[in-house]
């Protein structure tokens, strides 16, 4: 246990930050799952784009708050964008 008042305060601050970081990471995971669910359900392209934008927004919010490294975020967004593009191409192939 910390003895100094500043160390006690840091324990409190770290708990708060850990909680908020956990919430932010959970938002990212959930938004990515929703995006992938839209792709799996073979839904409309508009739904997929909306889900992609939501996931991308949550990922970038994590970067701005320091929860996630920018390179990790870029890799995740790139992967999701590639899946969206493949989904778009598959829809174009089936519509013709």
UniProtKB/Swiss-Prot annotation:
It comes from the Bacteria. It comes from Anaplasma marginale (strain St. Maries). NCBIfam families: S20. Keywords: Ribonucleoprotein, Ribosomal protein, RNA-binding, rRNA-binding. This is Small ribosomal subunit protein bS20. InterPro entries: Ribosomal_bS20 (IPR002583), Ribosomal_bS20_sf (IPR036510). Belongs to the bacterial ribosomal protein bS20 family. GO terms for cellular component: small ribosomal subunit.
């Amino acid at each position: 246990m910390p003895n100094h008042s500043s160390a006690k305060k840091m324990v409190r601050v770290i708990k708060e930050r850990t909680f908020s970081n956990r919430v932010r990471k959970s938002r990212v995971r959930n938004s990515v799952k929703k995006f992938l669910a839209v792709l799996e359900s073979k839904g409309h392209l508009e739904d997929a784009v909306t889900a992609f934008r939501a996931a991308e927004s949550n990922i970038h919010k994590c970067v701005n708050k320091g929860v996630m490294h920018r390179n990790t975020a870029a890799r995740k967004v790139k992967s999701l964008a590639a899946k969206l593009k493949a989904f778009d191409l598959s829809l174009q192939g089936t519509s013709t």
